[in-house]
């Protein structure tokens, strides 16, 4: 086992604080509308240029092991905030640095770190309550666009395209971000439920222009096994033919005699039918078939529930207004399922999302929710170069997370103003314990840090601006984009409540851990000079009688 260095007390905290400052100073230059870029080296290819706090934090690894521990703890603040709220990583880092900086002064002066921590926790609970009281629900498309713009470093085009996407697919719909082919951002919307399976035979195509099969007002047969024998299908086909309506068959596989008969009937015009494979694999396939059944108001024909193909009636089949089947995708538009059933299914999947342990499972479950809730929007990010594309894409993803957070918990005044107003509301908070009160006091001072940093990055004088904002009321704050004061909500400078709340809670949590640290154990640096010399390669060859 390698030798370890153990460092105690003030020296341990001082080294950790140095690490915190190095990381936070690199991250905080990106804060605000006039925040700067940070360039990140890549082991191959062009460097990455970013204004995303968590991207900067993730790149930082310090040489000094004790400093690095401090840096890694603050990196955790940024990552955790990003995971929960999807934005606010720079604000969280700035708050953590401010709480550590103020707190380490008190600890150095001899105050009890555990009492300080209790005070910090009480202050955070009170501030979060005030933020919730000040929160305003986001109702309009304009507010959603403003939140998106602020998160994307005041890029209005990003806010607008996200608001448009939410208008089209609803606030629960899936919105994905992809690389575009042009210089401009584009929005592509797929209405209804789409899954990645196409027709099993090109002979099903009835729209040669689009190379797709379009079924108007069709029935939908959902079967969880393979269909090879046409005899099993005949009762269903006869009933559908009598109703003079098209049929979509979704099964694990349709092949052999069954597929050949369906193709022949389609070509002869006897029956309009299309067969596709069921989406997904294993248990996920069963779940997705059940989703389609609920969306279309049908049943999954499965032996487990006592249903067989021979006994299927029209009441067991799903229905939709229109279905489009391409080579690789099938889209079900306006399924006939009951709204209450769809809502119940969505709730059920949401519970599974909360319980899911892997990111992959969570992502797949979220896709299912979106498909049931009403569509998929794809934002295609346009840029001139690959480097710009990466930077822009990261900003659009941040903005998307921020708007989702705003829809979830509402909005507060942006630009650090919400925290200052919360500070004013809890200014008289006291516990009767002087050391805990010191913890409360240091948090109330630290919440000024985001506004101070926004002003500093804009080239202003932080103390002057903070005093001016504290003298105002309500949403009165400082717009760093054009150096003016006014109502932040009217100026469209908004922050999602969830982002501000999460940033404060995570910053205080990690800062408290740092302040209550009394010893640090790290691997001792290896002494390079003590390494043994390499053995000589040609020793003993001097006397060769030359």
From Swiss-Prot:
Residues 536-546 have a biased composition (Gly residues). Its EC number is 5.6.1.7. The gene is groEL. GO terms for cellular component: cytoplasm. Coiled coil: none annotated. One of its GO terms (biological process) is protein refolding. ATP binds at residues 30-33, 51, 87-91, 415, 479-481, 495. Transmembrane segments: none annotated. It is found in: Cytoplasm. Keywords: ATP-binding, Chaperone, Cytoplasm, Isomerase, Nucleotide-binding. Its main location: cytoplasm. It comes from the Bacteria. InterPro entries: Chaperonin_Cpn60_CS (IPR018370), Cpn60/GroEL (IPR001844), Cpn60/GroEL/TCP-1 (IPR002423), GroEL-like_apical_dom_sf (IPR027409), GROEL-like_equatorial_sf (IPR027413), TCP-1-like_intermed_sf (IPR027410). Belongs to the chaperonin (HSP60) family. Residues 527-546 are annotated as: Disordered. This is Chaperonin GroEL. It catalyses: ATP + H2O + a folded polypeptide = ADP + phosphate + an unfolded polypeptide. Pfam families: Cpn60_TCP1. Forms a cylinder of 14 subunits composed of two heptameric rings stacked back-to-back. Interacts with the co-chaperonin GroES. Together with its co-chaperonin GroES, plays an essential role in assisting protein folding. The GroEL-GroES system forms a nano-cage that allows encapsulation of the non-native substrate proteins and provides a physical environment optimized to promote and accelerate protein folding. PROSITE patterns: CHAPERONINS_CPN60 (PS00296). It comes from Acidovorax ebreus (strain TPSY) (Diaphorobacter sp. (strain TPSY)). PANTHER family: 60 KDA HEAT SHOCK PROTEIN, MITOCHONDRIAL. One of its GO terms (molecular function) is isomerase activity.
């Amino acid at each position: 086992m390698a030798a370890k260095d153990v460092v105690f007390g003030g020296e341990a905290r001082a080294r950790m604080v140095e690490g915190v400052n190095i990381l936070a100073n690199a991250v905080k230059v990106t804060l605000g509308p006039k925040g700067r870029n940070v360039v990140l080296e890549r082991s191959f290819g062009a460097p990455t240029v970013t204004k995303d706090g968590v991207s900067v934090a993730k790149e930082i690894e310090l040489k000094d092991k004790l400093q690095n521990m401090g840096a890694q703890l603050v990196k955790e603040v940024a990552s955790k905030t990003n995971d929960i709220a999807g934005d606010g990583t720079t604000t969280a880092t700035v708050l953590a640095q401010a709480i550590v900086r103020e707190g380490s002064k008190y600890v150095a002066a001899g105050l009890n770190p555990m009492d300080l921590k209790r005070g910090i926790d009480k202050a955070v609970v009170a501030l979060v309550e005030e933020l919730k009281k000040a929160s305003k629900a986001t109702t309009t498309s304009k507010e959603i666009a403003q939140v998106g713009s602020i998160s994307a470093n005041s890029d209005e085009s990003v806010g607008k395209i996200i608001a448009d996407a939410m208008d089209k697919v609803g606030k629960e719909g899936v919105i994905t971000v992809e690389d575009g082919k042009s210089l401009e951002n584009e929005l592509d919307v797929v209405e209804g439920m789409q899954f990645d399976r196409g027709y099993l035979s090109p002979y099903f195509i009835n729209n040669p222009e689009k190379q797709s099969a379009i079924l108007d007002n069709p029935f939908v047969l959902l079967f969880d096994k393979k269909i090879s024998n046409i005899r099993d299908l005949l009762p269903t086909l006869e009933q559908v033919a009598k109703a003079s309506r098209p049929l979509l068959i979704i099964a694990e596989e349709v092949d052999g005699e069954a597929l050949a008969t369906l193709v022949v009937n389609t070509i002869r015009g006897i029956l309009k039918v299309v067969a596709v494979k069921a989406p997904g694999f294993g248990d996920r396939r069963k779940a997705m078939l059940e989703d389609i059944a609920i969306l279309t108001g049908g049943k999954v024909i499965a032996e487990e529930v006592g249903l067989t193909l021979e006994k299927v009636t029209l009441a067991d089949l799903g229905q939709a207004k229109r279905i489009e089947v391409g080579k690789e995708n099938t889209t079900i538009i306006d399924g006939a399922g009951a709204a209450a059933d769809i809502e119940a299914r969505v709730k059920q999947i949401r519970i599974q999302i909360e319980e899911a342990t892997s990111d992959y499972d969570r992502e797949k479950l979220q896709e299912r929710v979106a498909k049931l809730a009403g569509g998929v929007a794809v934002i295609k990010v346009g840029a001139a170069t690959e480097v710009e594309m990466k930077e822009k894409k990261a900003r659009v993803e941040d903005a998307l997370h921020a708007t989702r957070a705003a829809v979830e918990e509402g909005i507060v005044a942006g630009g650090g103003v919400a925290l200052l107003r919360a500070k004013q509301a809890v200014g008289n908070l006291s516990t009767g314990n002087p050391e805990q009160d010191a913890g409360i006091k240091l948090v109330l001072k630290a919440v000024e840090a985001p506004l101070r940093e926004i002003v500093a990055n804009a080239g202003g004088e932080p103390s002057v601006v903070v005093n001016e904002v504290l003298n105002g009321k309500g949403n009165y704050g400082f717009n760093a984009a054009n150096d003016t004061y006014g109502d932040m909500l009217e100026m469209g400078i908004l922050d999602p409540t969830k982002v501000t709340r999460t940033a404060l809670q995570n910053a205080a949590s990690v800062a408290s851990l740092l302040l209550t640290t009394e010893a640090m154990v790290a691997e001792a640096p290896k002494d390079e000079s003590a390494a043994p010399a390499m053995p000589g390669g040609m020793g003993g060859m001097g006397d060769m009688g030359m």
